[in-house]
Amino acid sequence: CRRQRQMCIRDRLFVVQHYKDKNILGREFMALKNKLTATAALLAASYAFGSVAYADVCDTPSKLGDMGSFPGEVITIQGSMLGTDQEMLLNTVSCFEKATGAKIQYSGSRDFAALVVADMRSNNPPNIAIFPQPGLAADMAAEGHLIPIGDEAAAWMKDNYGAGSSWVDLGTYADANGNDHFYGFAYKMDLKSLVWYSPEQFEDNGYEIPATMEELIELSDQMVADGNTPWCIGVESGNATGWTATDWMEDIMLRTTSAENYDRWVSNDLAFNSPEVINAMELYGKFSRNDDYVAGGASSVATTSFGDAPKGLFTSPPSCMMHRQASFITGFFPDKGAEVARGEADAFYFPPFASGNLGNPVLGAGTLYTMAKDSPATRAFFKYLQEASAHEAWMQQGVFLTAHKGADLSAYATPLLRKQGEILANATTFRFDASDLMPGAIGAGAFWSEMTAFANGQDANTTADNIQSAWDAIK
């Protein structure tokens, strides 16, 4: 299954050899760019409440182990992080520099993907390349440009990360000979499986945080009975309209079928019009196509901007009680996320079914640190990433999440980040956003557009058939 997933993601938009042909990328590239640019801007807006002042990031609750001594040795790192993210990364790796005497040289660029591939193919790679998604990392491994981190690191991650096996799989790719190795060390995660709400409204109405999907549906029904509207949902996003619906689908798939089926769905070994996928779509429809459930009625979902949707939590009276969206959405709140610091907004885990026996699945993303040029100091740096202290150093600065079960949760900069960190550490399954792993014509094309049609009243079977037809057309 892992190998099939790699073959699928090789067709992704981030495969650099396709960058040169803009006609191939077309609207798919622009639509995905629209989505990612908006997200990046909102993450920047969230820093105001997601970070704190710090005296010394290296003063962490956990003690840093012996990292060895590498005075004067240089480790080159390439990535896409800029601005505050770059500053926080450099603050964090300074702890490794102080402990070992090594020197980190980081080069960040918005054109990271094109630059790192050019450097690797010209035999001038960095020691470490930080990939924001697994597709391009898998391609570089298949071309022989990456060096395995090692089975010992994979075993460590399996034992010490929440949903450790999932993270190992995410960083495991085939080499030039088709043999699987562990290449990608996940460090710094993003979480999508969240439901936002107003603590004041929940308290005033006597509502409790649901622990299961059954309870979430019961809570939604109770809200309707009380004269309240449970959900704000919007899928409009310009050229990227529909992507929020795909996130709903992905979260529901993880709660209604196995992780193995999710992987088969990503690679289309499980057809889009299979019963498992149609069931997930219909459950999403239970939330999004129910006039009693949605602020503005079901017909408003397709035309409501995803950025405007959560604002209903803060109107007086509120037009909805809950909004499912990833952590970045706070940047779209009326006060750009200051509501969280004031206690006016909070989030809880999008829960699993009690009856499904599928554990605690989480949908999200994560950056992958890979080795492209070996050295003893570089090997030591990957050991550093295993240290709880390396995670706590960034946790203290803010806007950082980790699945490291040994990291001290008290190091998180805010209570909300701490709560999200607990969700990741307690996860039993983690999966990357499926639409980002599918070929661009599907994940940023038919999946988006057909889910928009679903929001406009198209039935689930037709929607699923149309997406499967798009898959068949590119095989």
Locate the predicted segments by residue:
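Single conserved hydrophobic/aromatic residue that forms the stacking wall/gate
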Residues: 1-11
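A structural signal for short loop-to-beta-strand junctions that line the ligand-binding cleft
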Residues: 118, 126-127, 158-200, 357-362, ...
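Extracytoplasmic "Venus flytrap"/periplasmic binding protein-like
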Residues: 91-167, 200-211, 312, 321-322, ...
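Extracytoplasmic/periplasmic substrate-recognition and gating elements
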Residues: 94, 121, 318, 325-328, ...
